[in-house]
């Protein structure tokens, strides 16, 4: 038995040339637990070398009534509206379980565009390619498109993604009650075999001095008949001051291990 400490810090830098555009950079530094001494399973630790790393560089600007973003290490979904009101503690629960579609990432160099209509409806889409093989036959490109509708108390988002090796559909949404908001998502990925996953969570915006989130879902998309693994989490976020918020949380995974026995 061993105890380890892991950390990650992100620095976001942003400037504007016209007041309507923005040039953004994200710098990460961190140290994650090594193999055999612990695990960061479920937590989004991108850096483990204890050195500063440029995690993303993007330029966002208006084009007519649309918004365009181009960048390196930039997610296609950075222009998506989404409809997930849940504040995830673990990476698995991010985007309400639709990380391959509504939360589709980038392959490297990314160009994406979104347009928001006055009615609450929005459309977005983009493409991302490997930096050295942009739109070539040998490179891997990711295409994504999203349609969303949001109102004061509810919203829904549907997205499709294609990375040449697989296609995926995802949908997430939320509904706000007076005391809490429920969010849910489902996703289906086809690589020749269809795999599916789901998420559901509750967000309580006013619990004491902070807010409480409780959720559960699959840790990935699983094919029919495959042994599924589930994750349960709870987190409480509260502000220490105007510039700092602390979010302690707990999570547990549960599924079938060797021989079909349950493993937690």
Where are these predicted regions, by residue range?
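Short, well-ordered, mixed-charge alpha-helical segments that flank or form enzyme active sites
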Residues: 76-80, 132-134
């Amino acid at each position: 038995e061993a105890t380890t400490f892991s950390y990650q810090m992100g620095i976001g830098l942003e400037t504007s040339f016209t007041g309507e555009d923005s040039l953004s950079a994200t710098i990460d530094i961190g140290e994650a637990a090594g193999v055999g001494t612990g695990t960061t399973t479920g937590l989004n630790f991108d850096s483990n070398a204890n050195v500063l790393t440029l995690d993303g560089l993007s330029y966002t600007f208006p084009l007519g009534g649309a918004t365009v973003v181009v960048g390196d290490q930039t997610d296609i979904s950075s222009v998506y509206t989404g409809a997930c009101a849940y504040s995830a503690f673990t990476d698995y629960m991010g985007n309400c379980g639709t990380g391959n579609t509504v939360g589709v990432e980038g392959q490297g160099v990314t160009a994406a565009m979104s347009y928001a209509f006055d009615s609450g409806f929005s459309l977005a889409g983009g493409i991302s390619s490997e930096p050295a093989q942009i739109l070539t036959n040998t490179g891997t490109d990711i295409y994504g498109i999203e349609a969303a509708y949001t109102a004061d108390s509810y919203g829904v988002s549907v997205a499709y993604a294609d990375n040449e090796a697989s296609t995926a559909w995802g949908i997430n949404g939320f509904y706000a009650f007076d005391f809490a908001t429920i969010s849910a998502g489902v996703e289906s990925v086809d690589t020749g075999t269809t795999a599916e996953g789901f998420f559901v969570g509750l967000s309580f915006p006013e619990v004491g001095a902070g807010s409480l989130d409780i959720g559960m879902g699959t840790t990935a998309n699983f094919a029919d008949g495959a042994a599924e693994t589930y994750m349960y989490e709870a987190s409480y976020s509260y502000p220490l001051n105007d510039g700092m918020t602390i979010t302690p949380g707990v999570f547990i995974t549960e599924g079938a291990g060797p021989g079909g026995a349950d493993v937690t």
